[in-house]
Curated annotation (Swiss-Prot):
Protein name: Large ribosomal subunit protein uL1
Lineage top rank: taxon: Bacteria
GO CC terms in record: large ribosomal subunit
Biological role: Binds directly to 23S rRNA. The L1 stalk is quite mobile in the ribosome, and is involved in E site tRNA release.
UniProt similarity note: Belongs to the universal ribosomal protein uL1 family.
Encoding gene, per UniProt annotation: rplA
Record keyword Transcription present: no
GO BP annotations, alphabetical order: regulation of translation; translation
Organism: Wolbachia sp. subsp. Brugia malayi (strain TRS)
HAMAP family: Ribosomal_uL1_B
UniProt xrefs under Pfam families: Ribosomal_L1 (PF00687)
Length: 217
């Protein structure tokens, strides 16, 4: 059963108050957009840095060579490697990370594992800032709380804003940042209502419908 509320703050307060699972539930968001998901030009995708982070360590792998190897290690990458790492993954090594970064001079060398990375949504992409010569800056940005988003086949964007241990104020800051970036990525061809509905919930909790989206962005 969905509970309706005009106030994002009230939604979040109720979610945190009613959370009853014996683990640290995440706070999830589902944004239903007024797009035609069958049209490629109306797909909405991008990245956003949540100002208060996501409440967990974001794992990053860097594929590169030369001086960038040491740069990536110093910047805190969880996995760093070159062609040897590519071959290990090709042979079945599991890659338990949230993001993959590569440098322009190495992008061609990850071709053998492009399908593996692509299937997990990890393929480096200049649009996401994950194919770059500034490896240290990319790692810093991602680990500060950067997440990816994209519309699914129903025109809905799913994401995480943090967890139930976050303060309501911090969750509101993340919510505002998330919705602002989605708004800035509105396709030119979309007419009429863009934000059809926004739902918030904890992992095991009820969904709360948030209205007056435009008021907070």
């Amino acid at each position: 059963m969905n509970i309706h509320s005009d106030s994002p703050r009230q939604c979040l307060e109720e979610i945190i108050k009613s959370a009853s699972a014996k683990f640290n539930e995440s706070i999830d968001i589902a944004v239903n957009l007024g797009i035609d998901s069958r049209k490629s030009e109306e797909q909405v995708r991008g990245t956003v840095v949540l100002p208060k982070g996501i409440g967990k360590d974001i794992k990053v792998a860097v594929f590169t060579q030369g001086k960038h190897l040491l740069e990536a290690e110093k910047a805190g990458a969880n996995i760093v490697g070159g062609e040897d790492l590519v071959q290990e993954i090709k042979k079945g090594k599991k890659l338990d990370v949230d993001w993959c970064i590569t440098t322009p001079d190495f992008i061609a060398k990850i071709t053998p594992i492009a399908k593996i990375l692509g299937a997990k949504g990890l393929m480096p992409n200049p649009k996401f800032g994950t194919m770059t010569s500034n490896v240290a800056e990319a790692i810093k940005t991602i680990k500060s709380g950067q997440i990816k988003f994209r519309t699914d086949k129903n025109g809905i964007i799913h994401g995480k804003l943090g967890n139930i241990k976050f303060s309501v104020d911090d969750l509101l800051k993340n919510l505002k940042a998330f919705l602002k970036v989605i708004k800035s990525n509105k396709p030119i061809s979309v007419k009429g209502v863009y934000f059809k509905s926004v739902f918030l919930n904890s992992t095991m909790g009820k969904a709360y419908k948030m209205s007056k989206v435009e008021d907070i962005i």
